[in-house]
């Protein structure tokens, strides 16, 4: 049985270091997805640097999400405050779900009986 630890990355190097060190002996692969867009839709720089985690480089599968999800709702100046907020929340959820689902692009060699953990 293999265990795959899959999660989204923003810029939490301290937490990531703890996670990798603590779980290393149990995990077959760490699948990390980083997006070029924040959940609010603003373009962002990528922060993950494999050189900070050389000890784990053979276990890390790093994926970059370089595009927005389909179905992002346009926000208009003429929208009321409540409508704008609703659209911001909806779009944020779409980005979050899309990035999380993007993890499947890094899952390889999973057999029946293996565990795939998807978390934050």
What are these regions (language model features)?
Residues 1, 28, 111-115:
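Short coil/turn segments at beta-strand junctions that form active-site/ligand-binding loops
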Residues 1-25:
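N-proximal low-complexity "stem/linker" segments adjacent to membrane-targeting elements
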Residues 3, 23-38, 57-61:
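Short loop->beta transition adjacent to catalytic acidic/histidine clusters or analogous donor-positioning motifs
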Residues 5-11, 33-34, 118-120:
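Short His-Asn-centered micro-motif
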Residues 37-118:
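Active-site-proximal specificity loops/subdomain of glycosyltransferases
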């Amino acid at each position: 049985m293999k265990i795959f630890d899959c999660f989204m990355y923003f810029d939490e190097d301290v937490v990531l270091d703890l996670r990798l060190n603590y779980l290393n002996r149990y995990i077959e692969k760490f699948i990390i997805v980083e997006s070029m867009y924040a959940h609010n839709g603003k373009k962002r720089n990528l922060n993950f640097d494999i050189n900070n985690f050389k000890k784990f480089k053979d276990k890390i599968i790093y994926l970059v999400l370089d595009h927005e999800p389909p179905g992002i709702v346009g926000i208009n100046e003429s929208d009321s405050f409540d409508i704008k907020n609703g659209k911001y929340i909806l779009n944020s959820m779409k980005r979050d779900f899309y990035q999380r689902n993007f993890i499947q692009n890094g899952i390889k060699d999973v057999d029946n009986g293996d565990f795939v953990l998807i978390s934050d």
